[in-house]
UniProtKB/Swiss-Prot annotation:
Enzyme Commission number(s): 2.2.1.7
Record organism: Chlorobaculum tepidum (strain ATCC 49652 / DSM 12025 / NBRC 103806 / TLS)
Top EC class, one word: transferase
Name by which UniProt lists this protein: 1-deoxy-D-xylulose-5-phosphate synthase
Keyword Iron in record: no
Binding-site residues, Mg(2+): D150, N179
SMART domains with a match to the protein in the record: Transket_pyr (SM00861)
Length: 635
């Protein structure tokens, strides 16, 4: 029972219930929240370290502020589990990241306490600025708070928003959750004195009095005096705290303070409520706080893909299933193999070295591996510069995050026909992370870009071969898309074999209906063909490999043998592989019947891969049933 395991937490049905508690009871609530997050992620997986790091901050925020009237926005949303627990969703947390359960990120349709949906980094301050502008235009008085991590502050969008907010003078609080992964806090007794000073009510009242008094002076004298006083204040802060930069953007800076000290957090947040201009509160937290393995290895425990043993911290693996190599690992190892022999190969990541397996490159050849932070736009143009300088840059990036650099891909890379390789990870569905992280659109948004070669491997060995081909057999920009997680278990060969550019391959000969798959959906086509064969059909199965250039010869062959052609892709049904095939058939073989299967024109929810494939109709059983119905319609 929840009430027995979490006696205080089970009595919290909304943030209003927190306001009845003493400081000691709030600290007990925080301890129960931390215990619940550890238990939850050990069972369901999910983002772990960030949520443990903001437990006290979340409790203090909901104690001081009035959610959902006050708007609280969590950047990225990795750290929002405790927020969900405290806003009436404790009993539902067992369903977190599960099919038809709670989302792993803030979601407006899930709760009025989720003021803004997130999943990608660096968006919170822009959203807060918009919410504050809407409040001011409507004449309302609610508070707006954005919580952003130091990693997300490497994204240019965050600084664009701060630059704008500082100019508007709007009442917004930005909380910098600094878990010391990117920004190093200053130390020392004088720093602590200044922290206490900036949060002191008397200091802030005196500061306001001095400012108001200077405003009464003659304009020229008053402004001169203000400038002098401001410079003195800024100089002292700049010497002992990292706040000068934020003050230059128009924010009052407070901190840094201990993000695990409930009393200090509440004091600071109460003071923030009294200030009616842009302000930034710098909070120092420990990622993974309260779980020793996560504190000792923060990058590893950023998220847990599956369950783990709470006592040992070791992953719990399903019995009897030998591990197959992951596409990410195969890519990372292959790139290192090639780069050790070729000094012109460079690797680029946007703050995702471990997720993309570029950490292998970092360890082997650190001088040629560049982590640019959460800055995909910069990463792409940086890669373009490397290509202009005679190097072969490989930018490894999740499909959903490459969307953020679309202009740079077109304008800075493709337009100049530069040899940049885009290794597009997490293409297709990604499971429990859901719609913010599915790679559902890359074939579509890349399809229209001139000069770009686009390919998708059907297995791990194909990925190795395509990487080699992209680096040595193609002169312009290249995109290779591959899915998350384990491969098919294909035999890996040490040598690299070039893939003929623009050529597919026949996986199964046949003549009744042609199944054209791209990427790992070619394997799904084979599974489907087995079911169709049992139903009396003789399917032709082709792995098309390339979206651009499209292998029209293999399509011509299929059209000459079969009356029906089926395309299968793990990408939006609009504008991708199927669209290209249908367009070609319309002009070259107008009598051939064709049907396309892919992801629907909708945002696919979260859940296990099997559950999601069934929902969108990309499992072999659903496909075979629909194809049999389609085949009954003779031309």
């Amino acid at each position: 029972m929840i009430s027995q395991a979490y006696p205080l937490l089970s009595s919290i049905h909304s943030p209003a219930d927190l306001k009845k508690l003493s400081l000691h009871e709030l600290e007990l609530v925080a301890a129960e929240c931390r215990k619940k997050v550890i238990e939850l992620v050990s069972q369901n997986g999910g983002h772990f370290g960030s949520s443990l790091g903001v437990v006290e901050l979340t409790v203090a925020l909901h104690y001081v502020y009035q959610s959902p009237t006050d708007r609280i926005i969590w950047d990225v949303g990795h750290q929002a589990y405790v927020h969900k627990i405290l806003t009436g969703r404790l009993a539902q947390m067992e369903t977190n990241r599960r099919y038809h359960g709670l989302a792993g990120f803030p979601k407006r349709s899930e709760s009025p306490h989720d003021a803004f949906g997130t999943g990608h980094a660096s968006t919170s301050i822009s959203a807060a600025a918009g919410l504050a502008a809407a409040r001011d235009l409507a004449g309302r008085k609610e508070k707006v708070v954005a919580i952003i991590g130091d990693g997300s502050l490497t994204g240019g969008m965050a600084f664009e928003a701060m630059n704008h907010l500082g100019d508007t003078k709007s009442d917004v609080l930005v909380i910098l959750n600094d878990n010391q992964m990117a920004i190093s806090p200053s130390t020392g007794g004088l720093k602590n004195y200044l922290v206490n000073l900036t949060l002191n009510k008397t200091y802030n009242r005196l500061r306001k009095f001095v400012w108001d008094s200077l405003s009464l002076l003659h304009n020229e004298i008053g402004e001169t005096a203000k400038t002098a006083v401001h410079r003195i204040e800024d100089g002292i802060k700049a010497a002992f705290t990292p706040g000068a930069y934020f003050e230059a953007l128009g924010f009052r800076y407070f901190g840094p303070i201990d993000g695990h000290n409930m009393e200090q957090l509440i004091k600071a947040l109460r003071e923030m409520r009294q200030l009616h201009h842009p302000k930034l509160l710098h909070v120092i937290t420990t990622k993974g706080k309260g779980f020793k393995p996560a504190e000792e290895n923060q990058p590893k425990w950023h998220a847990s893909v599956g369950g783990f043993d709470i006592e040992t911290g070791k992953n719990v693996k399903a019995p009897g299933k030998p591990a197959k190599p992951k596409y990410q690992e195969v890519f990372g190892e292959a790139l290192v193999e090639l780069a050790l022999k070729d000094p012109t190969i460079t690797a680029i990541t946007a703050a995702m070295p471990s997720g993309t397996s570029l950490d292998l490159f970092q360890q082997a050849i650190p001088s040629r591996c560049f982590d640019v932070g959460i800055a995909e736009q910069h990463a792409v143009t940086f890669a373009a510069g490397l290509a202009c300088g005679g190097f072969k840059p490989v930018f490894a990036v999740y499909s959903t995050f490459l969307q953020r650099a679309y202009d740079q891909l077109i304008h800075d890379v493709a337009l100049q026909n530069l040899h940049v390789v885009f290794a597009i990870d997490r293409a297709g569905l990604v499971g429990e992370d859901g719609p913010t992280h599915h790679g559902a659109f890359d074939l579509s948004y890349l399809n229209v870009v001139p000069n770009l070669t686009i390919m998708a491997p059907g297995d791990e060995q194909e990925l190795r071969n395509m990487l080699y081909t992209a680096l040595y057999d193609i002169k312009g920009p290249v995109a290779i898309r591959y899915p998350r997680g384990s491969g098919s278990g294909a035999t890996l060969h040490k040598e690299f074999t070039p893939v003929p550019v623009g050529r597919g391959r026949i996986l199964r000969d046949g003549k009744s209906v042609a199944l054209l798959g791209i990427g790992t959906m070619s394997n799904r086509a084979l599974e489907t063909a087995a079911l169709l064969e049992a139903a009396g059909l003789d399917p032709l199965v082709c792995d098309m490999r390339f979206l651009k250039p499209l292998d029209t010869e293999i399509i011509d062959m299929a059209a000459s043998r079969c009356t029906h052609i089926v395309t299968i892709e793990e990408n939006s049904i609009i504008g991708g592989f199927g669209s290209n095939v249908v367009n070609y058939l319309h002009h070259a073989h107008p009598g051939i019947k064709c049907i396309s299967f892919g992801l629907p024109d909708a945002f696919v929810t979260h859940g296990s891969m099997d559950e999601l494939y069934r929902e969108v109709g990309l499992d072999a059983e659903s496909l075979s049933g629909k194809i049999l119905e389609f085949y009954k319609d003779k031309p």
